[in-house]
């Protein structure tokens, strides 16, 4: 088995049973293509989401190092920060979050509702900054201040997206391959590509487990030119950790994130409404709505390699719907 080295890494259990992989009959009829969805939005902790897969590895490493505090960063409405804070609460750890307002809004819902509301429920210590211009350096500086207060901090990068955290999505690729075996031959997999860990982990895992399937990353914050090196660097770092080769081409579509990260667009919001009305499944305005807009347009523009079944990776994020209301 090519991914046997995964078992070498300490890992906590936050997810339990494999998340559902479901066929979407009404959505498939609407698009004229077989569409399946991987439901990481229903992971049974803190309203779910993809970062919990990464945090299984990262939090295990934090405990191994004797940390009593998790430190991370993101937007005010960061799903990653919300999930990190929940993990800290579950493990009896302190959590410090460095937050920015990337869209410069003064809207009350954005500043206080959705994920930001949940941070208060998890008793998160909030530190605001003007912008996360150099988040790794800013997190290290924050960790130094927290350590000076007597804590033992463990820094988790934005999105949990380092080689260790991204192992969670190599593990997810294993889960997907097992669920598809003998049931469906997936031609294409679509995922939102942001901090790059989810995309890169899937790239490594699927290359070895489902090599005939293409993986499309729909960018949510950057052009292909800016996003590609992030994904490739993580892909290679993961492969090194697992003592594997990773040579699969990284495919990115950057036509769907405008006008920028965290700013909803019409195509993304139409995708949110469509899946809600046809399947009762909630996407979000920042990540999955834009990624689904890419899937929908990709079918109409014949951008996929063939007309076979497509798997959409639902990474979660529904709490943001409340934060972006009434603009949703």
From Swiss-Prot:
Q: Return the EC number.
A: 4.4.1.15
Record GO biological process: D-amino acid metabolic process
Give yes or no: UniProt keyword NAD.
Answer: no
Name its co-factor(s): pyridoxal 5'-phosphate
GO MF term set: D-cysteine desulfhydrase activity
> Which positions does the record annotate as the modified residue N6-(pyridoxal phosphate)lysine?
51
Q: Which Gene3D superfamilies match?
A: 3.40.50.1100
Tell me the subunit arrangement: Homodimer.
Q: What protein family is recorded?
A: Belongs to the ACC deaminase/D-cysteine desulfhydrase family.
Q: What is this protein called?
A: D-cysteine desulfhydrase
């Amino acid at each position: 088995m090519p991914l046997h080295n995964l078992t070498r890494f300490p890992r906590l259990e936050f997810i339990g049973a494999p998340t559902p992989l479901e066929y979407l009959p009404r959505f498939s009829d609407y698009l004229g293509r077989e569409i399946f969805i991987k439901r990481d939005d229903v992971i049974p902790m803190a309203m779910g989401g993809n970062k919990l897969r990464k945090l299984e590895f990262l939090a295990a490493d934090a405990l191994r190092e004797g940390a009593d505090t998790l430190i991370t960063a993101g937007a005010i409405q960061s799903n990653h920060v919300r999930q990190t804070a929940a993990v800290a609460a579950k493990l009896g750890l302190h959590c410090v979050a460095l937050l920015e307002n990337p869209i410069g809004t003064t809207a009350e819902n954005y500043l206080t509702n959705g994920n930001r509301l949940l941070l208060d429920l998890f008793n998160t210590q909030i530190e605001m900054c003007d912008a996360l211009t150099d988040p790794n350096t800013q997190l290290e500086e924050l960790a130094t201040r927290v350590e000076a207060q007597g804590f033992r901090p463990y820094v988790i990068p934005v999105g949990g997206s380092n080689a260790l955290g991204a192992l969670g999505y190599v593990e997810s690729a294993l889960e997907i391959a097992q669920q598809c075996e003998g049931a469906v031959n997936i031609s294409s997999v679509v995922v939102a590509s942001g901090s790059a860990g989810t995309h890169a982990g899937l790239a490594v895992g699927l290359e070895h487990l489902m090599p005939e399937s293409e993986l499309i990353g729909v960018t949510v914050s950057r052009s292909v030119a800016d996003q590609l090196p992030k994904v490739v660097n993580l892909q290679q770092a993961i492969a090194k950790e697992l003592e594997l080769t990773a040579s699969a081409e990284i495919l990115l579509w950057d036509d769907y994130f405008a006008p920028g990260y965290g700013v909803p667009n019409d195509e993304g919001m139409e995708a949110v409404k469509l899946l809600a009305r046809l399947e009762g499944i909630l996407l979000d305005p920042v990540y999955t709505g834009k990624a689904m807009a890419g899937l929908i347009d990709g079918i109409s523009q014949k951008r996929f390699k063939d007309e076979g079944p497509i798997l959409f990776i639902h990474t979660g994020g529904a709490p943001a719907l409340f934060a972006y209301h009434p603009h949703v």
